[in-house]
């Protein structure tokens, strides 16, 4: 169990450990789905068919029939992906183009739901095969969480832990609920109700709520993509511009960061837009910082250190105490610093 107030900041590299796409892979997947073209104007020969079905539903609800402007917006995104830092950056650039934003969200939603379905932690017949993938950070985190915990302690197991994930997937919530159920031999309902107590911020939204979470569009982890629910799921994804306008969520997220005693960055790229979202306005607690910098150059690691310090500086007062960065993946960082973190 974590004794210090801890915030985990999670990026795409962390979900990569369970088989979800990182930046370039996600851009490639989105390109394939949004490069929508037709032979003779009728027979679709490229792009995602379910997205096209969703477009027909969208324009029909608008009282229109022509999906070509939306398809064109999709092709614009597809052609620009090799130039983009990420799909998030591209949508931020074109935040005033409603068609591009809509198509980008549809591409993200379809790609992530498909990736969840093929991920290592997709529960086959309702059960995750924990033996097949013991060396993922999700498993190591749960072992740290459960260390010295007895059944009577379960209600407070998440008291000192929160997550900020910049990923659209639900890997964290999905895995933890299944892990608690199997390890502590409790019912699925009990495990899910416990996991509801874990604070998980999704600054850019998520591809639907898990059925047991309630609120919003309900989508099971690994569920087959439906063209009917895809527009609603896409509606739960937020661009950087939209998220900056969500004052209540940002205030709560930054309060958790400000009140933490340690911050652990896992598979995170430390991009400037995201660091801006993480920047705290006030603070009174010095923090230990641990982060992965897998495959980063020495100059970029120095820049990362500066960006983190800036995000944790208020009125010229810096609140970073110890800083440790490891050129490895998330699971190795948790294992190597286990005794320092719990």
Q: In which residue ranges do the predicted regions lie?
A:
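Short catalytic/ligand-binding loop motif for oxyanion handling, primarily in non-cytosolic enzymes
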Residues: 16-19, 171-174, 208-212, 272-275
